[in-house]
Regions:
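Hydrophobic transmembrane alpha-helices and their immediate loop junctions
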Residues: 1-188
């Protein structure tokens, strides 16, 4: 399988997924930043919603690239249920961002499934850690929020339940799962 190749269908699904995530992002950012006066400008809220969307896209692309490196077919697809839940969560106090997922086909092993599942949350853990380190040294509130968003994305996805990334990682290697989950906890 080609690494970092996108079909027209996948690009359409990624674009629609990104729009849904950005919508939730605007509501979520407004919710968490409402007590921070300097972040309550329209420009800052939009920038944070874009960063939120990029964090989601990088998470999904990490899954895709990881699967493709294992020689598997991998493309992002919207799901009707996920898109509706994501859309509805704009109006709910709890935000659920799951407009779709990277669909993977081919002969997967427990290891390739686990490593591919880990790739998304690990990307968010790295982004959160880098932003936290810079935020600590610069006292930049904007970076704290980006770090927090990425930590939440990682933590939520590492829950070892159902179709979550965490279950694939847990089945593959419980120690790796514990380290990843443990790394995301203090970042939140």
């Amino acid at each position: 399988a080609k690494v970092f190749w996108f079909s027209t269908t996948e690009l359409k699904h990624l674009a629609l997924g990104a729009l849904l995530v950005m919508g939730v992002g605007l509501f979520f950012i407004h919710q968490i930043a409402s007590n921070i006066q300097e972040l309550m400008t329209t420009e800052i809220l939009v920038i944070l919603a874009i960063v939120f969307t990029l964090s989601f896209l990088l998470h999904e692309l990490a899954h895709k690239i990881s699967a493709q490196r294992f020689g598997l077919w991998a493309e992002f697809r919207l799901t009707m249920q996920g898109a509706l839940i994501t859309l509805l969560s704009m109006l709910l106090p709890i935000k659920i961002i799951s407009p779709g997922a990277v669909m993977i086909a081919g002969p997967m092993t427990k290891e390739s499934a686990g490593k591919t599942g880990l790739a998304g949350p690990l990307t968010n853990i790295i982004l959160s850690t880098v932003c936290t380190i810079i935020a600590v040294t610069t006292q930049n509130t904007f970076l704290w929020i980006i770090a927090y968003i990425n930590a939440l994305i990682a933590l939520f996805n590492l829950i070892p339940f159902g179709i979550m990334d965490g279950l694939k990682v847990f089945w593959w290697n419980k120690m790796v799962w514990a380290i990843a989950f443990g790394a995301s906890l203090p970042l939140t």
